[in-house]
Amino acid sequence: MKYDHLLVRYGELTLKGSNRKKFVNQLRNNVNKSLKGLDGFVVKGKRDRMYIELEDHADINEITYRLSKIFGIKSISPVLKVEKTIEAMSAAAIKFAQQFEENSTFKIDVKRADKNFSMDTYELQRELGGAILKHFDNISVNVKRPDHEIRVEVRLDAIYMYEEVVPGSGGLPVGTGGKTLLMLSGGIDSPVAGMEVMRRGVTIEAIHFHSPPFTSDQAKEKVIELTRILAERVGPIKLHIVPFTELQKQVNKVVHPRYTMTSTRRMMMRVADKLVHQIGALAIVNGENLGQVASQTLHSMYAINNVTSTPVLRPLLTYDKEEIIIKSKEIGTFETSIQPFEDCCTIFTPKNPVTEPNFDKVVQYESVFDFEEMINRAVENIETLEITSDYKTIKEQQTNQLINDFL
């Protein structure tokens, strides 16, 4: 079947009132960015639907795949746009039926947005079903459990006919909900947390704490790859890599061993808080899950959060670990997340970290050293990378450069 349009159904933005135009415009911009590099199509965003007009050479499968990854889209259907005459509709219905297997069953489903159309729903079903039955002897109707369902939408401008409905990613268009800073560790949880807030229309930049030589270049490349996977959904993402060795060593030098994890997290939050103000973000996002590890109890969260007045969003707070793993596999980050390269949160983990840290104690331990200068130095020396969906890892870039230099 050669389709001439893609019908794109909106997600939650259909619930928006006077702001709907803003959401539709943002979604159209996101669609155009996602389809960059492809040709043979024209995007037409309307208030209630988006239509993508296809030329003969358009790669409909690739376009549909990319659309399915965009937040704000509920579903996509390859459609035939048909004139509002029974003759044109019957001819299109026969085209669909030509693709059916022998002895298969079908039904006609009609939705009339144009209530002034000359035929009602039942009449259309009868006429189109009758046209198919007259043309084929080995096809029958089954309205309860059909093998095929031809869907017909009667709209003001034309008739749209289709069979397939491809699920989209739902949510709201990225860019409509403000900017956040994602604390990206390299584990399973934080990429999922980033994906969850992006699904609510939020733009993200990511921050990662790197402690060489205790953490390897492979750990850094792992985080770059996780960012690249997230960028497949939303376009380029800035990744801020913080040189954290000096701060982490000092924490382990002056803070009681049971409190080093709490204090380390507080230092991370202080660095993140400064970066939030630099980039104009409105919140910090992390993958914390209540009670999962020692640093994620309510007592720990209270002690850690105390260093910032910036809102901290925890979209995975109440998830079961198995739920997070399932989502990680769905979004394509799981296999990268489980690569055995340690991050700075795991290399200095104490044997018996405190699970209910006393806030006054952690402040007392940190008071023996003025960390502010180190924190400012870490922020000043941040390495910022813009990660795109086709971003090559540092190792690949270096290898290519060496090859080019050699040649």
UniProtKB/Swiss-Prot annotation:
Residues 61-165 form the THUMP domain. One of its GO terms (molecular function) is tRNA-uracil-4 sulfurtransferase activity. GO terms for cellular component: cytosol. It catalyses: [ThiI sulfur-carrier protein]-S-sulfanyl-L-cysteine + a uridine in tRNA + 2 reduced [2Fe-2S]-[ferredoxin] + ATP + H(+) = [ThiI sulfur-carrier protein]-L-cysteine + a 4-thiouridine in tRNA + 2 oxidized [2Fe-2S]-[ferredoxin] + AMP + diphosphate; [ThiS sulfur-carrier protein]-C-terminal Gly-Gly-AMP + S-sulfanyl-L-cysteinyl-[cysteine desulfurase] + AH2 = [ThiS sulfur-carrier protein]-C-terminal-Gly-aminoethanethioate + L-cysteinyl-[cysteine desulfurase] + A + AMP + 2 H(+). Pathway: Cofactor biosynthesis; thiamine diphosphate biosynthesis. ATP binds at residues 183-184, 208-209, 265, 287, 296. Catalyzes the ATP-dependent transfer of a sulfur to tRNA to produce 4-thiouridine in position 8 of tRNAs, which functions as a near-UV photosensor. Also catalyzes the transfer of sulfur to the sulfur carrier protein ThiS, forming ThiS-thiocarboxylate. This is a step in the synthesis of thiazole, in the thiamine biosynthesis pathway. The sulfur is donated as persulfide by IscS. This is Probable tRNA sulfurtransferase. The lineage of its organism: Bacteria, Bacillati, Bacillota, Bacilli, Bacillales. The gene is thiI.
